[in-house]
């Protein structure tokens, strides 16, 4: 794959971290004419040579071999951040490193896209937002489910009110514990399975319903042995039960999957990544396979970030304030299951 030099009005992007998500973002940027890959950073010389074939992830195949001949390469994030050829920084590092690198980028006047989860605490998220606004730069968190075609179509139907009131909703996301990246099994670096996986569904609920008033969660937590699974009940003002469930609790042979069932007065929306595209089962007994966007979700996400950065516009479709709220809800889920009590904001 090549990254041709393009002229005029481009956003020059530097990608920090060439693991699974960094590699995924590189593929997407190659399809975005308004962006130019200016720099990459990774501690592994092999990856800086363009050989990403050792990369593993829970979706997709191995990494590619890329052409970095016209790209600045760094082993140190601070050096990339200081590169005057870079307009925006895409941070694909372990979660505990997000805040310091983002702060350095804002201090250098760069726009920032940071992978999910935004950070490990609500306070860290707030600090990042304050720094972005103080620098007058764009900050967006890569919550890709907001751009996933099936989730986008479901959101439009739920929020339009055309199917009536919500009766219940359940979201699943599950896989085996990652066999790559030892840091993922360290809760002080990753936050565990709740932060790695369920943050997507928590954020989607944030987009649909706002922040829950109370969270009750149960589930085993044994990160040393690759087990971190949660079933959580999120309470909202609308009163309908919302369940978020999943994590790492399966053998390595078990494939990654995500699914949801949203029941409304006028019908049920159901999606399963392995077996069923988004389908609407109407109350009148008919069913409909819904028309979806054909654009890859990662490409759509990065196109939106590039558009916002070029216009110096806050990303209202994927606000970092919502990402921070999702982090707080994830923390409440962990607090609830550890204390074996409801985390209730109404108290």
Regions found by a protein language model. Name each.
Residues 1-108, 126, 135, 345:
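N-terminal glycine-/serine-/threonine-rich beta1-alpha1-beta2 phosphate-ribose binding loop
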Residues 1-7, 35, 46, 88-90, ...:
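C-terminal helix-rich "cap/oligomerization" subdomain common to oxidoreductases
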Residues 24, 291-303, 318:
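Active-site loop of classical SDR/Rossmann-like NAD(P)-dependent oxidoreductases
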Residues 108-121:
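ADP-ribose/adenylate-binding Rossmann-like module
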Residues 118-138:
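Rossmann-fold NAD(P)-binding glycine/threonine-rich loop
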Residues 138, 145-223, 340:
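Predominantly a Rossmann-like dinucleotide-binding segment in NAD(P)-dependent oxidoreductases
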